[in-house]
């Protein structure tokens, strides 16, 4: 099996319950909800996507795990890896999960939730999109871009998740969207406001 990886880097997690935690990010190329091409954005399920995930480098299993290990500080413990995209579950398979675990990584995944998990993942963050049925029945984190046409946070009242986050939709209306998300959280305390702190920190 080979994997197409758009980028692989060491950073601090900028969102959610693992905010500030050092992590190796593996961003897989490709998504099932948008091609990533601007000319196709109007037809995308999530037209608001702000992530570049087209193209990348091919890795074999051993090479990808070795690249992740090489990024981790020498001699440091608590290895943490975030698999993201695009949609990582289009490529992530059981052998990769097993190999990352064998290398000592706690493995987290950021997914739109439309694809099943191929094996044990230590931390699952699901970010549902309007019109995209979920294949996952639970998550550690539920992260919803807000406001999002065609989807209401109340729809996920019964969805099992340890943490529920509202992420203000980025773009020209960010200030207003942040105010709207904050107001919703104040009225529905089961939701927490999620801000992309890595952008404020000036890191990837």
Where are the language model's segments positioned?
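Conserved AdoMet/S-adenosylmethionine-binding subsite of the radical SAM
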Residues: 77-79, 89-204
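Conserved Radical SAM active-site core
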Residues: 3-6, 10, 22, 33-121
